[in-house]
Amino acid sequence: MDIVKKYKQYFTPLDLAEFMVRIVPDCNIKTVIDLSMGECGLLEAAKKRWKNAEFYGVDIDENLLKKIHNKSPYIHIFNGDGLGKELQNWGVYQNILCGSKFDLAIANPPFDFYDRKIVNIDNTGFSLPIEIRFLLKYLEIVKEGGYICIILPYGFLSLDLYKEFRKSLLNKAVIHKVIKIFEGCFEGICADTCLLLLQKKFSFKMYMQESISIEYLDNEYTLFKNTSIMINDNVENRLDLEYQNLLQKLDFIKERCKYPIQILSEYVTNCQRGKTLAGKKELTTDKGIRFLHTTDVKYLEISNKQPTYVSRTNDYFKKIDIAPLSILIGRVGKACIGKVAIIPEWYSKTVISDCLFCLETEGIDPYYLTLYLATSFGQMQLKGLAKGSCSKYITKKDLLTVWIIVPDVDIQIYFREKYLKLMKKREGAKKSLLLRQLVSEVEKFLEKE
């Protein structure tokens, strides 16, 4: 088995390692540990700044440790699982834990969403993957007032799965920085990643911090301070940059917009997702019911270039017939989030993939609503609400929270007629350009104060 795949190893680039060392505010670091040190790049970067500190590294890969012992003999090394019981046999490590504990933990732990275990925290059980269990271990072995600088999957900041855990984390540590790392930083990883800088709280100072800084790190290793969020019980516990930027933009729009703004759920009578054809290829046929996948949803239209049909007689699709005037919205996939189209009135019934949401609406013109969702107002919400590290997705609950600018009915009808006229044109680049121009017209109209 490939050693990288076996141990989920994706080593830290030198520039990122040096950046992580640089943002730690404490100049008086005496002990540093990395429980999954890989090629020990983080500890070597730390050595450049804290030359007189003691460095401790653990890794499960024995071959790597042999190289590290020859290259960086100053590191106290241990071969084993950084979360395993065998650490009890590491004497120098145990001596520090019995004393003041470690000043700094610096880490790029292995990521594996499916390597999950139940962990009890304050009498509450959490199902946590290996990377989050490493974070908990660091909170255990770092001294009060000590720092943890750790790389995690970006989904940790947004997934509902971690919502309560993120709240509990604020009781144990001050989160000084949340930083989204630029795409492509780690070779061989398609997942988005983030960097957290935390400081373990003093037991006698159990206060709740008032705000968290959320920033973006570009490929020049320059930080852009995008936003600072206030922490209170009424704030949705999401720490991802896109969502927090979305909240700020929505507040700005609500203050300036001259038209009513309503939540999408006010107009939705039915919201459903479709079914997958994976493993069901026998259901496809030359004639039957049209099956729509995200690849069929182009810019504000449904492509007919390579149609797929499924059997009319099979019960698998029985309850997901999609009626004309339903709105299709991309549910999952980075390239699909933000896709929208309407099933026009002249379409017969269709069925859809589970990668799509289908909305049936009343009280608002569906053609106008589809156009609105394609504007910057709609797109920033669809993309800002998306969650996850690898494959972004939107939940039904979040989708229904999208805010809709609702002009007068005559305005909705005006844009409806223009949209319908364009939809009857031949599919192609010219039609796509005209649709984009129409969306731009809608945006300019809604931006009027």
Predicted region positions:
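Conserved Class I SAM-dependent methyltransferase catalytic core
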Residues: 62, 127-183, 195
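Sequence-specific dsDNA recognition surfaces
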Residues: 265-280, 295-324
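Non-catalytic DNA-recognition/assembly elements of restriction-modification systems
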Residues: 220-282, 408-449
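Class I S-adenosyl-L-methionine
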Residues: 1-71, 75, 86, 158, ...
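S-adenosyl-L-methionine
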Residues: 73-94
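A short beta-sheet element
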Residues: 317-320, 324-373
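Conserved proline-anchored active-site loop of SAM-dependent methyltransferases
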Residues: 20-23, 32-46, 81-82, 96-119, ...
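Basic, amphipathic alpha-helical recognition segments used for DNA target recognition
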Residues: 202-204, 298, 348-349, 354-410
